[in-house]
Amino acid sequence: MKRNIILIMTLLALSIAYADRENDLPANLNSAFTLGAKNSSSLQVNFTLPEYTLQEETQGETVYRKIELPLSGTLLDSGMPELPVICTSIAIPCKGTVNFEVLTTRQTVIPDFLPYPVQQGNNLESPKSFVINNSYYNSGGTYPETLMEISEPSILRDFRIITIQINPFAYNAQSGDLTVYQDISFRLNFTDEQGINELVSEPTNISASFGKIYESIILNFNDYRNTMVANTPPRYLIIYGNNTDTNFANALNEYVLWKKQKGADVMVASTATSEAGNSTTSIKNYIQNKYNNVETRPDFVVFIGDTVGSYTIPYYTQSSGATDYNYTFLAGSDQLGDCFIGRISVENLSQFLVVLNKIYLYERDINIANASWLNRMMLSGDNAPSGISTMYIQKYIKEMSLLTNPDYTFTEDYGSSPNYSVINQTLNQGVGFYSFRGYIDWV
């Protein structure tokens, strides 16, 4: 379930980044799935394995083989075979449970196959200690044990969804055979039993701001497309750290006006006790009350203020780190955000004005002739202790980005100790996108 959530959130982030590209949404592997017969109690789904290649990887005197399947994820058990997986999401009925049954399969077998093991550590071009589960490679059985998995239902704002993970490659260490599933047909069965994360009713008023995300990750979104009203103004909820500085108020009003000029509906509140309040609980409740009313349900929540300074806004703590993401858990008991959230992390008026000038330059006053930096990206991953997935997600972002814009260039930095001077230098030179995954603590 955890890796399914990670995949979904990665797709969410990418969909946000490319939301303005109407006809150039990055490709994904949803094309590997097609929908079959459906009714109120079941849905048939057909899977066809996309084209893949085999590459050799030499470690010492041993030659391993690696399966290359663009845009796919992989199993991430350190030292075990690195085998691609393919996922999609399905919108399911608002109530009930889901199970599946495999109907038919077509597979081939590649004999004498030695798969490259998953490595926890630096990017593949850097020296590191080689990791292999010798116990499995010497006498293990079939890995993975299951052909497919489905997650528990989650709520992604308007939809109740499940994630389906197909494991099209299965390795048997005893025989040395790699089984490749070329075609799989399966059926999802929907029951009336009480399930988890149920919705009150089927989607009737879908957020246009989430439209590209739904289109990108929900395989059967076309069944619901007509319930989304095109060109609906995005709704912003801006919450700022309470203060009485008239210069701050003037700058804030200018920012709100700019959002309205762009066509957004904007609601504004401070952390005064009479408004949103100054604790995580009161602010979360304030956002929740706005969300529960379809007339005020925010698509975007923007905090103005850092965790210290003149405009403080409190934060949640996750694994000893500060986060605002918990504020977006507004529907269901899952960890999928139900609105977008961002923080303008400023401690004083001077910082606020600098950030606003950058926002206006980017959104309103940009000089395209001098904006080559829009085609540059910085990708960085700190894999200690977060693991190799910090690199895999950045590589995935790179693949998706190049499908959208082949002119993108990249500065990449991976390792257990990120090179902060490289990161700062790259940011100062200008980038259109910056993605960092892992632990971070530098000025």
Describe each PLM feature range.
Residues 10-18:
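Hydrophobic h-region of N-terminal signal peptides that target proteins for export
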Residues 1-4:
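Positively charged n-region of N-terminal signal peptides that target proteins for export
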Residues 19-443:
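Cysteine-dependent hydrolase recognition
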